[in-house]
UniProtKB/Swiss-Prot annotation:
The keyword Transmembrane applies. Keywords: Cell membrane, Cytolysis, Membrane, Transmembrane, Transmembrane helix. GO terms for cellular component: plasma membrane. It comes from Bacillus velezensis (strain DSM 23117 / BGSC 10A6 / LMG 26770 / FZB42) (Bacillus amyloliquefaciens subsp. plantarum). This is Holin-like protein CidA.
């Protein structure tokens, strides 16, 4: 029960952070999406240990686990544009497949690098 409550709180904090960054981006008329700026800021805060990973880890893990659910509204919205899909469907599909492949390869490579680095760090600290 405590873990569930902590997860919900962390998701709420991530949501508030995202809304705040989107608001700031809109208020300052920045042409970069708030989500991109938010990721960079969150990464920077985590890197410099201003925010501890434990403060957002459970919520972020749940959001990543349920990521597919967040794409359903977008997929349903595509149905409304059947004429565009019939005209450019193959091109759109090609872009989606290639970009998905690039993201998967990049994510897998980065995850392996991080895991190796973490393992190396744990090995060095256990030897000391």
């Amino acid at each position: 029960m405590k873990k569930l409550l902590l997860t919900v709180i962390q998701i709420a904090l991530l949501f508030i952070f995202a809304r705040l960054i989107n608001w700031v981006t809109a208020a300052l008329h920045i042409n970069i999406p708030g989500s991109i700026i938010g990721i960079v800021i969150l990464f920077t805060l985590l890197h410099f240990k201003i925010i501890k990973l434990e403060w957002i880890e459970l919520g972020a893990a749940w959001l990543l686990g349920e990521l597919l659910l967040f794409f359903i509204p977008s997929a349903v919205g595509v149905i409304e544009y059947g004429d565009i899909m019939s005209k450019f469907g193959v091109s759109i599909l090609l872009v989606v497949v290639i970009s998905t492949f690039v993201v998967m390869v990049s994510t897998g490579t980065l995850t392996q690098l991080i895991a190796k680095r973490k393992e190396k760090k744990q090995t060095c600290s256990s030897e000391s």
